[in-house]
UniProtKB/Swiss-Prot annotation:
Belongs to the snaclec family. It comes from the Eukaryota. One of its GO terms (molecular function) is toxin activity. It comes from Bothrops asper (Terciopelo). Its main location: secreted. It is found in: Secreted. Keywords: Disulfide bond, Hemostasis impairing toxin, Platelet aggregation activating toxin, Secreted, Toxin. Snaclec that binds to von Willebrand factor (VWF) and induces its interaction with GPIbalpha (GP1BA) (via the vWF A1 domain), resulting in platelet aggregation. Intravenous injection in mice induces a dose-dependent drop in platelet count (thrombocytopenia). Pretreatment by intravenous injection by this protein in mice potentiates the hemorrhagic lesion in the skin provoked by the metalloproteinase BaP1 intradermally injected. This result is not observed when both BaP1 and this protein are injected simultaneously. This is Snaclec aspercetin subunit alpha. Heterodimer; disulfide-linked.
Length: 62
């Protein structure tokens, strides 16, 4: 189970954060959000679709 505000896909938790950050700041930020947290690293096509949809949904919210 993922914390409130996070989305689950194949046993992993994902969350879109705003505003944009550079790579180093984003990685640091992600490690502070949850134990084992890190920037997403796409491993397979289904995960790519899931993350793409998550980004699109969050950008549409503004």
């Amino acid at each position: 189970d993922c914390p409130s505000g996070w989305s689950s896909y194949e046993g992993h938790c994902y969350r879109f954060f705003h505003p944009p950050k550079d790579w180093a700041d984003a990685e640091r930020f992600c490690t502070e959000q949850a134990k084992g947290g890190a920037l997403v690293s796409i491993q397979r096509f289904g995960e790519e679709d899931f993350v793409s949809n998550l980004i699109t949904k969050n950008l549409q919210r503004g």
